[in-house]
């Protein structure tokens, strides 16, 4: 399936100079959405994962459906102040500053096999932070899956130590 037909490029959103990839048309097409979920779920099963992890917000849209389809647990990664129980936190560097990602302490069990799912792979900063959160709880990242890859924004060797799925490249 040509998924690019279901992803719109919105120029200068949310700020000038950014070409935003709008996935809402894909979500609004039952066949395209089902195709993405099926492909990601196959990848999760092939990786032997028992947990799917995803960051907010658009990662949740795909990962929750994939977790259901692959019959795995789903663990949320959120920005500070959004999770109600005790969290583990990681600070990571962005191009112009730092950011934090958090998950509930204990949601990843020692030995869990994890696939991380997100909508877009850009610089890789978020995904690298999530890998560290998983490893801090003695989980093992088996693979990473993305709907969209923006290879111009990251090193080609990024994530080479993992199985990687990228459904669309721009």
From Swiss-Prot:
Which species? Mesoplasma florum (strain ATCC 33453 / NBRC 100688 / NCTC 11704 / L1)
* InterPro entries recorded: Ade_phspho_trans, PRibTrfase_dom, PRTase-like, UPRTase/APRTase
Q: Which GO terms describe its biological process?
A: adenine salvage; AMP salvage; purine ribonucleoside salvage
The UniProt GO MF terms for this protein read:
adenine binding; adenine phosphoribosyltransferase activity; AMP binding
Entry EC number(s): 2.4.2.7
Q: How does it assemble?
A: Homodimer.
Give any Gene Ontology cellular component.
cytoplasm
PANTHER family in the cross-refs: ADENINE PHOSPHORIBOSYLTRANSFERASE (PTHR32315:SF3)
Pathway, per record: Purine metabolism; AMP biosynthesis via salvage pathway; AMP from adenine: step 1/1
- Enumerate the UniProt keywords alphabetically: Cytoplasm, Glycosyltransferase, Purine salvage, Transferase
Q: Domain of life here?
A: Bacteria
Q: What is its main location?
A: cytoplasm
Cellular localisation = Cytoplasm
Q: What does this protein do?
A: Catalyzes a salvage reaction resulting in the formation of AMP, that is energically less costly than de novo synthesis.
- The identity of this protein, by name, is Adenine phosphoribosyltransferase
Protein family = Belongs to the purine/pyrimidine phosphoribosyltransferase family.
Which CDD domains does this one have? PRTases_typeI (cd06223)
Q: Which reaction does it catalyse?
A: AMP + diphosphate = 5-phospho-alpha-D-ribose 1-diphosphate + adenine
Give one Pfam family. Pribosyltran
């Amino acid at each position: 399936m040509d998924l690019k037909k279901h992803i719109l490029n919105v120029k200068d959103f949310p700020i000038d100079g950014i070409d935003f990839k709008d996935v809402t048309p894909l979500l609004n097409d039952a066949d395209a959405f089902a195709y993405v979920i099926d492909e990601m779920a196959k990848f999760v099963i092939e990786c032997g994962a028992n947990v799917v992890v995803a960051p907010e917000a658009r990662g949740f849209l795909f990962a929750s459906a994939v977790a259901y389809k692959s019959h795995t647990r789903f663990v949320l990664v959120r920005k500070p102040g959004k999770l109600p129980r005790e969290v583990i936190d990681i600070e990571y560097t962005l191009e112009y500053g730092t950011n934090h990602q958090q998950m509930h302490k204990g949601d990843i069990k020692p030995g869990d096999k994890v696939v991380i799912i997100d909508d877009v792979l850009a610089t890789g900063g978020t995904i690298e932070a999530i890998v560290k959160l998983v490893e801090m709880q003695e989980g093992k990242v088996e693979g990473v899956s993305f709907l969209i890859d923006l290879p111009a924004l990251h090193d080609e060797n990024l994530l080479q130590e993992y199985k990687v799925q990228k459904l669309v490249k721009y």
